[in-house]
């Protein structure tokens, strides 16, 4: 009888295997650690993202329910999942979760980090909404020869037109989400971020 693989140590964090999801990342290790909207380390990475409107401002996460994930070493990465109230959504995808920021400053494949962040999101929040996950990409911020949002497309997202502001809209259907897998823990205690609901079930 095969023994269950033990979590591997990577720095100070315990790396847990991701359960197979049939969507392209089964068996990979979750590298994301749980952060929150008040974490200065996460804010520093957000300040370097092209969609940051007020660099240095304390707030880098939209109001409402959110999940902030961070990688600090050997190179930073940031992911923010947001579940806006459909009553206040102005785009044509009300009900969808939204990735409001993703930045990978390391050498990892961005598509793999995206799938791992999705796995951590469904672990925290439960099954995704029927509308799935949405993200917007500014085509003017990508290299001329690059496909806007290519790493998201590699992770299973599909193009769904444009926002009113001309951003490329990419959507991941609910059926394409990976199986849930918990993020790692780090020094910031996200339990005090009351908007990160359903983290402790």
What residue ranges belong to the model's regions?
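Non-catalytic substrate-recognition and accessory regions of acyl/acetyltransferase enzymes
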Residues: 2-145, 150-201
